[in-house]
Structures are given as C-alpha cells and as structure tokens.
Amino acid sequence: MRFNINNIGLVLCVFLLTSCVYTKFTVYKSFENIETNIRYYKVEEKDGVYKWVEIGIHTFFGAGRKDYLTVSFKEELPKNLTIKSSNFGNIDSAYREDYKIFSKRINIKDVKSDTVYLEFNDNKRYKFYYDFEEK
C-alpha cells in the first residue's frame, strides 16, 4: 500500500484546522451600581432572595465563528424570570435546568451595542449592556 505524503499532509492540515477550537467570553456591564465579583452580578429575585448571574457573549472559534448570548446562574434558577435582548429577542432557546444556563446563538455582525433585561415576576428589572465597538 502506497501513501502519498502530500495527501497525508493535506488530511492532517484539514484535521487541525477543523478540530482546533478555542473560546472567548466577554461580560456585559450593569447600568445599575450592583454588587459584582468580576463576572457575576448579585440580583434580587424577590424580597431578600438574591441570585448571582453572569451575562455575556461566548464565542467559539474553530472551523467557523459561533457567538452565543449566555445568561448563567451560580445557584438554582430563579422562578418566573424573563430575559430579553434589545437586538436578539427572548433568551430561552437552550435552557437546561441542570446547567442553570439560558443561551441563544446570535449574529453580531453590524450590531453596535446590546441591552439585556432580566425581569422577575414581581417587576424587579435589571439592565445590562455590551458595546461591541468598545473592544
């Protein structure tokens, strides 16, 4: 059996290009002056019940670029929560209770900024923003 070294090199190159994946996560900022620990913000679900939430753009690089708007919680998920983005609509497409994550694939092309609204059942509302031109 004969192997052509050029074919092996081509296959190896394609494999490396498609299998090398790395990620980047950038955090949204809060409009309000609320407690934070760099990536997570402390929000009040209802009187005296607080949750730590992280909101950001999670980008996967590999064979192609994929961007996701991700909202994750450190503890159990809050009840009666609505998450909306000014550019990308409702964020609920990849909800999994065991992961405590809401995620939606987005296209950030031509988007200058975005605002995410977390709204709890008792009308508590938090706003977070991301400026894509600030990078």
Task: Go through the PLM ranges and name each one.
Residues 124-135:
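Edge beta-strands of extracellular beta-sandwich domains
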